[in-house]
Amino acid sequence: MRPSTVTSRIWWSESSSSSSHDLSGSWEHTSLQRTSDHFSSMGSIDSLDHSSQLYPSGHLSSAKSNSSIDHLGGHSKRDSAYGSFSTCSSTPDHTLPKADASSTENILYKVGLWEASRPGSSRQSQSTGDPQGLQDRPSSFLPRVPGNSSKSPRPEDNIEPKIATSGRSNFGPVWYVPDKKKAPSPPPLGLPLRSDSFAVAARGHEKARGPPFSDLASMQHFTTLPHVQPRGDRRMETTDRQWKLAHPSSGKEIGNVGYQPEGHLDCRWLCSDDRAGRPSGAPGRHQFSLSSTDVHFLKSYHGSQHPQPCSDESPRFPSSPRELLRITPSGCLQEPPELSQDDNPAQVRWPGSVNQKLDDRGRSHYFSVPHRQPVHGSAHVLIPRSDYWHSDTTPVDLECPLLRPDQRGYPQQYEETPASHERGGYQQLNAGIEGCCSGIHEPPRASHTVRAGLQCPGNDFKLVDAESGRISRQRTPMLHSLTQDGAWRPGNSKDCGNEKPPLLDAQVGKPTRRSDRFATTLRNEIQMRRAKLQKSKSTVTLAGDSEAEDCAGDWRVDVGAVPEGSFPSTYKEHLKEAQTRVLKATSFQRRDLDPTPADQYPGPPEHRTCDHSASSSLSSFPGEPDSAPRLCEAGLAKPPSSAGGVPHILRIGGRKRFTAEQKLKSYSEPEKINEVGLSGDHSPHPTIRTSEDSVGTFADRWKFFEETSKSLLQKPGHRQAFCGIPREKAERPQTQGHECESTEPWFQKRSRATSCGEILSEDRKVEKASEKLNPPRRLGTFAEYQASWKEQKKSLEARSSGRYHSADDILDAGLDQQQRPQYIHERSRSSPSTDHYSQEVPVEPNRQAEDSGGQKEALLCTLQAEEGCSAPSSSVLSSAQPQDSQHVNEDPTSPQPEAQLSSKCQHLQTSTMETSRSPSPQFAPQKLTDKPPLLIHEDNSARYCPVTACYVFIPCRLQVFVAGALPQLQTLGIERVMDNNTTVKMVPIKIVHSESQPEKESRQSLACPAELPALPSGLEKDQIKTLSTSEQCYSRFCVYTRQEVETPHRARPPEPQPPSTPAPPVRDSCSSPPSLNYGKAKEKTVDDLKSEELAREIVGKDKSLADILDPSVKIKTTMDLMEGIFPKDEYLLEEAQQRRKLLPKVPSPRVTEDNSCPSLSAICYNLGTRSKSVPVSQLIKIKILASSPRKQDPGMPGVVSLATNSTYYSTSAPKAELLIKMKDLQEPEEYSAGDLDHDLSIKKQELIDSISRKLQVLREARESLLEDIQANNALGDEVEAIVKDVCKPNEFDKFRMFIGDLDKVVNLLLSLSGRLARVENALNNLDDSPSPGDRQSLLEKQRVLTQQHEDAKELKENLDRRERIVFDILATYLSEENLADYEHFVKMKSALIIEQRELEDKIHLGEEQLKCLFDSLQPERSK
C-alpha cells in the first residue's frame, strides 16, 4: 500500500467503500483516536478538511472515494495531485487542548526543518504528469520512516518521516504573517504559496525551474528558526506517535504520501505541522475550532504565539481577511485543480524561492500529507497576511486561486489527466480563476459567502481599487465579502494583519456552528439539489476541441516561463480572459429570470464572478455522469452578481423560479423549455469571443465532444443524462477519462456542463429556424452520428441543436438528405428509446421528409393496403377522391414530395384514408417507421398502419402485399366496388375485390419483378392467411398477417370466389360480408327473395316437400354447433380461397348475389365471382325457381327426411345462370293456360336442375379441398421434418402429439356436433303425439351428447393451450418463414377438416333434396 493509502487509512477503514453520496456517514470521529491530535498540522486545522463533503453528490468525496486510495495507489496520474494537496486532517480534534494550537511560526519552523533535513535532490519531483515521480519521491524518504522519530530527541532527526507519513495532510503553508505592527515589507523570502493561487505563487511559477528545494528549505528555516528549539522535542514525540497511528505499516506505505485520494485538495502551500516537529501541545494546534463548518483563520505571526483558543461551538473569525483564502469546500485548501497535481510545478512555493524547481515543488507537497478524509468538510480559511507578500505581488488575488475544488470537490487536477499535469501546476496560471470561478462548492449554508469570497477579482488584484464600483454588497454580495474593509488591497494589508473580518458564514445570516457539519449539510443539500436537477430540463453544453486547444495553450503558462516582474499583469490578464470566457460560455444568466437589470453584469466581463463559471455546472466526470451538474446547477448556479442586494438572496436550489407564464410555456411547449425566460432579442452569441482563447463556438464544442466521446450505446445507463438534452449531448466522454480531460481546460469542462445556459437556449432558437432548412438526419448508430459531426463544422447559426423531437419529428427525420442536415438522434418527448426503434435502413435522397408520423404511416398503410384493391397501375380513383388520386398515383421514379402527401394525410387518416390507393406497392412512398418489428422492404412494401394496428408487411413466405381488405379497415365503413374500370363505390363494411382475369393479368404485368419477388410455389398454402380474393392471392397483394395480428379479424375477411368459375353453392351463401356467419344471411338478396317465393309456391302445392323446401323450417347443423369452438368463418373463408383457385370453371356471365345488400354495391361483399358485367336488370330478371331462405344451413343430412331447404345451396353464379336459362325456357309455359300441375312440375324440374348443378359444384369443391388437404399435409410433413431437426426430442414429441391430437379433437367435435344437431332436429320435428319412449330416448341422447360435446370443448381448450406451448418452443428454433409455415399448417389443418365435413354434409343434403324432388315428380309423370 502506498503512503497515500496509509495516510487515509484512519478514515478509510470504514468509509473507503462507502457510497459517494453518503458524504459524511462513515466519518467516525471516535474511530480516529485522536489521530487529528497526532496528525493535525495545526490542531484544529484538521477540521479544515471537513468541507470535503462539498463534492457534488455524484462525485466521490475526498474521504469516501472508493478509488481514492486504491486507485491513487495505482499510480493514477490524478493521484499525484492528491499528494500535492495537503488536505488537512478531516478528523476534528475533539480532545486536543485549546492551548495546543500551532502558530504560523511553528508550521513554518517545521517546514524549514523538513526542507533542511532533506537533500534538495531527494525533493526533486518528476515533471507533472509523471506518475513514477510520485513513487520516487515517497521512496526517497522511505528509509527515514521507520522509528527514528521516536528515538531522536531532535526534531530534525525524524521530522521528515513523520511529516511525510503523517496521516494528516497539513493545511497549506501557513505563512509568516507579521503583525500589522511589524514592518510592512516581509522578508525577501516568499511564503509557501499555492503556485497558482496567489500572486506570489505565480511569481514562484515564473521561476518554477528555480533553485533546488534546498533553497526553499533554507528560506523556510529562515522564517521559522526562532521557534525551532522550543518545539523540537515535543514535536518529535507527537509526530512519531502520529506516524505510528497513521501508518501502521510505516515503511512501505510512505511511498504513497504524495498520492492523495480523489477529492483531496492539494495543500501544497502548507507543510505539515506535525511533520515540522512542532510539539503536539503547541498552542498553534488549537488555533482553529473543530467545528466542521467553522471558518478558521490563522492568526498573525505574533497572534499565533499567543493564540486565543476558540471554542468549538463559537463562530470563528479570520485573523485577517487573507485567511479567507484558505477556505476549501473539501476542508483543504484547494488550488486550481490543474495546479494541485502532485507534479505541478506550483506546488509548495515560497515567494522568495524564485529558483525553486518544479521538482522541488513537487517534493515539497509530499510533506503535506494529504488527508483523504476531511471529516466535516468545514470550510476553514487560512489566508496569509497580505503584508507578508512582496509589495510587487498584490495579495488581492490570493483569494482568487483559492480552492477550486473540481466539480466533484476534487481539485480540477483530478479531472485533468496527466496531460493537464504536463501543462504544469500552473497550467492555468490564473487557475485562481478556477479556484474563484469554480467557486467553492460548499454547502450553500456555510459557504455562500465563501463562494463569493473565493471568486477572483477582476482586472487586477485590487478588487476594490478599480472595480469597487462594480462590486457591492447589494449586487455582488460574494465578491463584496472579499473586498470589504479593503482587506485585499496591498495597501491595507498591513492594517488588517490582526483584524478579524466577520465570519464568512455570518454573512449568510448566522455564524457557523460546530453543529452545522458540512458533511450532513452538504450531503442533504446535494441530495436535494440532485433531485431537483433530475427534474429540471437542464441542458449541458459541451466544450469544443478548438477551445480546448486554444485555452490549453493559454493556460499552459510554464512556471519558469513567466518573468518575476511580469507575473501580476500576466495573472490578471488570464483572470480577465478566463472569467470572460467562462461567464460568456457558461453563464446561467437569463434575462427573464434575473430580477433586475443589475444582473446583466453591466461591468466588464472580467468582473463577473468566476464563481459563476463554477456554478455553471460541474463537468460530468467519466463514470459520474450525473454528479457534475448537480451541485453547481442547483446550488451554485447563481451568478455572483445576480442582483438582489443581500447575500442570502440566492436562487432557491440554485435557480430562480419560473413565473406562471413561463411554467405554462414550459408545460405547453416542452420542446421550448430551454427558451423559457429568454427575451427574443437577447442573444448570447455576440458575447462569444472569437479570439484564439475564446471558449469557442458550440460547433467546436460539439466537435470536441465527438472526438473525445465514445459510443453512446456503450453506457446505456447514462443515456438519460439530462432530460432537456438529446442523449448525445448529455452523454459525456465517460469512457475517455483522462484523455478527454487532458485535452480541455477547466473552463471548457464547465461550459461543457453548463446547464440551461443562455447560449444553448439561444442556439436552440436559431436551430429551430435552421432545422426547417436542414432537417436533422437520423443515424442508425452512434458511430455514424459521431463520425458525422466531423463533417459538420457549421456556424452557430446554422447549427442544429438536439432539441426535443416529438414522435412526429422522429418520423420526419432523415428523409431529406439532399441537404446536409445536422445528424441528430431525435429523442421522443415521451420515450427515450423511440429513436432506436427506427430501422437502420438507408433512405434514398429523393424521399422527402414528411410532416406527421402517424398520418404518414396511416397513409402509407392505406396506400399499400389498397394495392390489392387497385386495378391496373394506371387506374385512377373515382371522382369521389380527387385529392387522393393526386398524391397516390405518383410515378415511382419521381414521387411527389412527401411534404405534399403529408399536407393531405390528415384527411386520409379518417375513414376516407382507405380511399387513397396507389396502383402498386412501388408507388407507395417509402418511409422509415419507428416500429422495430417491421419488415422494411426495398420497395417500401412493409408498413405498420397505426390506424388499423396491424402490420402490413411482405411475408417471409409470400412476398405478397396488402390486398384491399385489412381486417380492421372494415370498421371504417369503407367498401370498394371494383369493376373492370376500377371505379370505386363507397359502401359499408369491407372491401374484397375480385378481379376479372384481364384485371389480374394486367395487374400482375404491372408488378415489377424487380420490386416484388415472384410468389413462391407454396403460395397456395399461405393463401389461407390472406384476407382477399383468390385473384389477390395471385396478384401478390394479399395481406399475409401474422397469426397474432390476424386472429381478431381472420373471421372477418370475406372470402372471394373465383371469378372464372361458378363458386360452390356452399361458398355462395358465404359470400356475404364477414360479419355474416357462413351459410347464414342477415339480409336477403333479390335472388333469395325469388327463391323463397318459388319454394313457397312448390310447398304450397306439394306439402310433402314442405320439410325440405319450407324457408321457415329451422334446423340445426353441425356447423351451428361448431360455432364458437373454431372460428368457422375464418377457416372456411380461408379454405375457400385455397379451393377457389383450384376450381377454374366455365367463365359464364358471373352474376353477383350478395346476401347483405340487394343493390349492386352488395357485389363487393361477394366472395364469389363478381362479374361487374352483369347488369342489375339481368339480376332482377333472374327467376329463382327453387330456393328457400338461406337462414337454414342444411347441416344434418338424414335428421329429418328431406328436411332441408334450398337455401342450403345459396345461389351462386352458376345457379343464377341456370335459373336465367330455365326462366327463359319456362316463361312461355308459365304464362300459358295455367296447368298448375304442369307448372309445379316445371318448377320442380328447375329446382332439380339447380340443385344438381350445385351438387356438381360442391363435388368439384370437395375435390379441390382434398387437394388442399394434401398440400397442407405435405407442408405439415416439411414442418415436422424441420422441427425434428432443430428441436429436442421431447419438444418434437410435444409437437407431434399436438398435431395428432388436433386432428382427433377436431373430428371428435365435428362428430359430436353432427350427432347432437340430428338429435335436436329430431326432437324439433316430433309429431304432436309422439310416443313417450321416442321422445324420452331422444332427450336422453341429447343429454349425453351435450355432455360429451362440453367435454370435447374442454379438450379443445386444452389443445389451444398446448398449441401456444408448442408455438413458443418452435419460435425459438424456427425461422420466421418456417414458423409462418407451421402456423399456416396448424390453422389450415383444422379449417380443412371442418370444411371437408361441411361439404360432405351439404352434398349429402343436396342429394336428399334431389331424391325428394324426383320422387315427387314420379307420381305426376305417372299421371
Curated annotation (Swiss-Prot):
Residues 1-101, 116-171, 300-357, 586-630, 758-855, 872-930, 1045-1085 are annotated as: Disordered. One of its GO terms (cellular component) is adherens junction. Residues 575-677 form the ASD1 domain. InterPro entries: ASD1_dom (IPR014800), ASD2_dom (IPR014799), Shroom_fam (IPR027685). Residues 1054-1065 have a biased composition (Pro residues). The modification Phosphoserine is found at S103, S185, S197, S291, S806, S830, S831, S833, S918, S920, S1072, S1329. One of its GO terms (biological process) is cell migration. Keywords: Actin-binding, Cell junction, Cell membrane, Cytoplasm, Cytoskeleton, Developmental protein, Membrane, Microtubule, Phosphoprotein, Tight junction. Residues 1092-1418 form the ASD2 domain. Its main location: membrane. Residues 761-771 have a biased composition (Basic and acidic residues). The modification Phosphothreonine is found at T834. It is found in: Apical cell membrane; Cell junction, Tight junction; Cytoplasm, Cytoskeleton. The keyword Cell membrane applies. Belongs to the shroom family. The ASD1 domain mediates F-actin binding. Interacts with F-actin. This is Protein Shroom2.
